[in-house]
Curated annotation (Swiss-Prot):
Keywords: Cytoplasm, Methyltransferase, S-adenosyl-L-methionine, Transferase. Gene3D superfamilies: Vaccinia Virus protein VP39 (3.40.50.150). Disulfide bonds: none annotated. It holds the Pfam family PrmA. Its EC number is 2.1.1.-. S-adenosyl-L-methionine binds at T162, G183, D205, N248. It catalyses: L-lysyl-[protein] + 3 S-adenosyl-L-methionine = N(6),N(6),N(6)-trimethyl-L-lysyl-[protein] + 3 S-adenosyl-L-homocysteine + 3 H(+). GO terms for molecular function: protein-lysine N-methyltransferase activity. Transmembrane segments: none annotated. This is Ribosomal protein L11 methyltransferase. Belongs to the methyltransferase superfamily. PrmA family. GO terms for biological process: methylation.
Length: 312
């Protein structure tokens, strides 16, 4: 079977929005080529083990390539013109850079290779290493491994917003904590919380593809007894209180449910929130404080911010 590779050249700021557009028009997986990510991974003691320096030549010298793979079937031209229209609409809201779209035809075998070749085992925090399900990997004795196949859900674990969240969870979680993960995607944050000592984790997502992916990943990692994955719209209908409320969703979505997050956080508990682009930091911080939280810490990676807010 022939597949088409669609490549959009964009900015780091617009990666998630462009990835979403590609998913919406029917892409079967997205590959992100960002030279800054590549250089960071190379610098983090995996040099030569996992990343091959010659791969760097395939990355754009500036900006980011978001690549997606779709069957080269009859309605491909409609899909492409829809995508281009949506990219132009996005341009009115966000700095998307050139937004240039290029197309290449590839064989299925190459597609499988292209989709997975950049997704390798990555140590994402002191204790946790994410390993793609299809990779053979022998962990070090102190390494705690999360096996992941995100499929079409967001959450390879290696996006800065996810890494910030997992590092904060590792820092603040206490043995026996009860955790809720809003917008679980592949389930990566919930699995991390379970592996780091949570007594229970409730994982919610609006998207049925994410719910299915999270359920599979939870089972693969043997934490099905601890993590309950359900469909849910933010914290609507959720009752009870949690030691940790975690959410890696865009700032504009976080702003919608800060008050609900406060209500669902135990006294002395924390709301760990990520997915906040730098320019939205003040707005989210102010809204957290207005809801009654104290800002305990703000972590930054590239253009992204995670805020750890405490309920006194
Ligand atoms: C940026 S991804 C984060 C995935 C994963 N938690 C991680 O950290 O990598 C955001 C997720 O939030 C979900 N989402 C968006 N709006 C939502 C809503 N209103 N209620 C629940 N989930 C939502 C999306 O479907 C997506 O899976």
């Amino acid at each position: 079977m022939k597949w088409s590779e669609i490549c959009v050249h964009t900015t780091q700021l617009a990666v998630e929005a462009v990835s979403n557009l590609l998913h919406e028009v029917g892409a079967q997986g997205v590959v992100i080529e960002d030279v800054e990510d590549f250089d960071r991974m190379m610098a983090e003691d995996h040099f030569g083990e996992i990343w091959d320096v010659s791969d760097r030549e395939t990355y754009p010298t500036s900006g980011v390539h978001v690549k997606a793979y779709v069957p080269a079937s009859g309605d491909f031209q409609d899909l492409l013109s829809n995508l281009k229209k949506e990219i132009e609409r996005l341009r009115t809201m966000l700095d998307i850079g050139s937004g240039d779209v290029t197309v290449a035809e590839i064989d299925e075998e190459d597609w499988a290779h292209s989709w997975k070749q950049y997704y390798k085992p990555v140590k994402i925090s002191q204790q946790l290493t994410i390993v793609p399900l299809w990779e053979e990997y022998t962990p070090q004795p102190e390494e705690n491994v999360i096996l992941l196949d995100p499929g079409m859900a967001f959450g390879t674990g290696t996006h800065p917003t996810t890494m910030l969240c997992i590092q904060a969870i590792e820092n603040y979680i206490r043995e026996g904590d009860h955790v809720i993960d809003v917008g679980t995607g592949s389930g990566v944050l919930s699995i991390a919380a379970a592996k780091l000592g949570a007594a229970s984790v409730k994982a919610l997502d609006l998207d049925s593809v994410a719910v299915e992916s999270a359920r599979q990943n939870v089972e693969t990692n043997g934490v099905g007894e601890l993590v309950q994955v359900d469909t849910g719209d933010l914290l609507k209908g959720v009752e009870g209180e949690y030691d940790l409320v975690v959410a890696n969703i865009l700032a504009d979505v976080i702003l919608l449910f800060i008050e609900d997050a406060y209500a669902r956080t135990k006294s002395g508990g924390r709301f760990i929130t990520s997915g906040i682009i730098g320019e939205k930091r003040a707005e989210v911080t102010n809204a957290l404080v207005a809801a009654g939280f104290e800002i305990e810490e703000t972590r930054v990676m590239e253009d992204w911010v995670a805020i750890i807010a405490k309920k006194g």
